[in-house]
Amino acid sequence: MSKAVGIDLGTTYSCVAHFANDRVEIIANDQGNRTTPSFVAFTDTERLIGDAAKNQAAMNPANTVFDAKRLIGRKFDDPEVINDAKHFPFKVIDKAGKPVIQVEYKGETKTFSPEEISSMVLTKMKEIAEGYLGSTVKDAVVTVPAYFNDSQRQATKDAGTIAGLNVLRIINEPTAAAIAYGLDKKGSRGEHNVLIFDLGGGTFDVSLLAIDEGIFEVKATAGDTHLGGEDFDNRLVNFFIQEFKRKNKKDISTNQRALRRLRTACERAKRTLSSSAQTSIEIDSLYEGIDFYTSITRARFEELCADLFRSTLDPVGKVLADAKIDKSQVEEIVLVGGSTRIPKIQKLVSDFFNGKELNKSINPDEAVAYGAAVQAAILTGDTSSKTQDILLLDVAPLSLGIETAGGIMTKLIPRNSTIPTKKSETFSTYADNQPGVLIQVFEGERAKTKDNNLLGKFELSGIPPAPRGVPQIEVTFDIDANGILNVSALEKGTGKTQKITITNDKGRLSKEEIDKMVSEAEKFKEEDEKEAARVQAKNQLESYAYSLKNTINDGEMKDKIGADDKEKLTKAIDETISWLDASQAASTEEYEDKRKELESVANPIISGAYGAAGGAPGGAGGFPGAGGFPGGAPGAGGPGGATGGESSGPTVEEVD
């Protein structure tokens, strides 16, 4: 059976999603992006769609087509079309009363209808889904703005047919967003009003829906077909053109390439300012060899766009007036469109409704595709009883894990894992003869536990005396369908066990905090990875030094090593250990160099001794350092020890 998908065919970006295994998956494209630009470009040699088309738009403006959604299903003499055509860098001409787009392709002049251009974008979305699902995709639910008339809807359906899709249904974008939040399920307490605030890349739509037992009625719509993220980008671009002029006495406003590079940087800065209070822009050789380095704060950005931001409230008032209801009668407000990530917009909307909580837990640029995928699953009968009830509660919103040596967050359940789920890993002790371990449970995306949220902790004591790395402690995380987490620890030698239960409300984060943490985590990811690598290098050096110490003092080996060698090696080990104690904040490179130094002393001595013992050749990797795969291998030792200093055996992470 072919799989059904939901496609949000947007003015500037499109998105595709699929419903399977009781959850919706937003499908990323070959660039790893979860939304794909609705761009098609024609060159001398090829046709490009999506990111590849948008990326070359600056070099090839006349043959790069976008905003086809503004033309689809309209007549050439439509005032909207006439107005839009003035601003497009590509040619729009009249063909039998309809607008068609004229481009140069492989050396010839070609014309394409808006339906054909949209069908190319839909084909791209279909291919993205097929690449991920590994099978043909035929059936799709495609979304359109609520104000689209019959001919625009039919033209969109035709675009789907051209793309080889069986369009199951054309549904309204606000309806799809409401379905995504399961608002059709919220209590069958008769009709309730839902306001959908959709601020996208190029358009702004506000819709008021009345939902009654799964029936959606569009009560009123309003908006601005020319207000969106691109306008905010323009304000930034103009601001920086002036700044460049002030600093360098040069005007870049006529140089297309410089403008395109500046616009790309501005779009990126705008996105960053949704999660951080300021950001920097660095463009090498922007114009006539001059580098442009500057920064902008969130406050300044909000000031530059203040009138645009405020103007988004006018259509909200209009929709309420048209539907003849008071704002206190609106039960749910749903944010859709990437531009609703802007904190100031969220605040304006919330304040307008007297501080009401907004629905924004689904990525705003994905909510429409999400709802379309649910609708597609329902229409193809590809659902389960569970679907209907816990459509949106079926993933762990943040990674869950425990703290291991060095304050490192070791994740057992990664974020977005489908729940219920169960996962076990084996850990060991950090010090010789350690009597107990403290199991601390955290949620969050950062590499160090201090940056994450502590959910609870418990002690597992009564571990019999043993060298570090020998005891095996199995930690199990188990989340049930209600999101309640049970964490247990079992010491395999004695069978001792301890557990803790963490319920949803106790110490868990709110949705807003989750969104904030996830966006911060992206920002900090690089620093985090560096820090994790540094701690890993430190732990590896420490483990190596201690396992060497065990090796030369262990019964079989100590007789094989000459007194001089033993003294030399012991001195090197002790120096390394005391250097480690004094150098907790050294760099990855320093730890690695120190390890190499120690290896250069140890390897010849150990291999000589192994030769004498007739054991396995190679240096004592002993039990390798922490990090990598926690496997619970017992401590290193005699001639059967791992070969080579860089042992390839499983690594054991240690719990303080």
From Swiss-Prot:
Keyword ATP-binding found: yes
Regions of compositional bias (Gly residues) in chain numbering: 611-647
GO biological process: biological process involved in interaction with host; cellular response to heat; chaperone cofactor-dependent protein refolding; protein refolding; response to toxic substance; symbiont entry into host; symbiont-mediated perturbation of host immune response; symbiont-mediated suppression of host defenses
Effect of deleting the gene: Does not affect cells growth and hyphal formation. Does not lead to any significant reduction in killing by Hst 5.
Chain positions covered by the region annotation Disordered: 608-656
Major location (coarse): cytoplasm
Listed GO MF terms: ATP binding; ATP hydrolysis activity; ATP-dependent protein folding chaperone; heat shock protein binding; peptide binding; protein folding chaperone
Gene3D superfamilies: 1.20.1270.10, 3.30.30.30, 3.30.420.40, Actin, Chain A, domain 4, Substrate Binding Domain Of DNAk, Chain A, domain 1
PROSITE patterns: HSP70_1, HSP70_2, HSP70_3
Keywords, alphabetical: Acetylation, ATP-binding, Cell wall, Cytoplasm, Nucleotide-binding, Secreted, Stress response
Pfam families hit by this protein: HSP70 (PF00012)
Subcellular location: Cytoplasm; Secreted, Cell wall
Keyword ATP-binding: yes
Modified residues (N-acetylserine): S2
Domain of life of the organism encoding this protein: Eukaryota
Gene Ontology CC: cell surface; cytoplasm; cytosol; extracellular region; fungal biofilm matrix; fungal-type cell wall; hyphal cell wall; nucleus
Induction: Induced by heat schock. The promoter contains at least three heat shock elements (HSEs) that are bound by the heat shock transcription factor (HSF), and one stress response element (STRE), which is an upstream activator sequence (UAS) that causes transcription activation under stress. Expression in repressed by SSN6. Expression decreases after exposure to ketoconazole. Expression is also affected by farnesol.
Role noted for this protein: Heat shock protein that may play a role in the transport of polypeptides both across the mitochondrial membranes and into the endoplasmic reticulum.
Record-stated family: Belongs to the heat shock protein 70 family.
Assembly with partners or alone: Binds human histatin-5, an antifungal peptide from saliva.
Annotated protein name in UniProt: Heat shock protein HSP70
Species annotation: Candida albicans (strain SC5314 / ATCC MYA-2876) (Yeast)
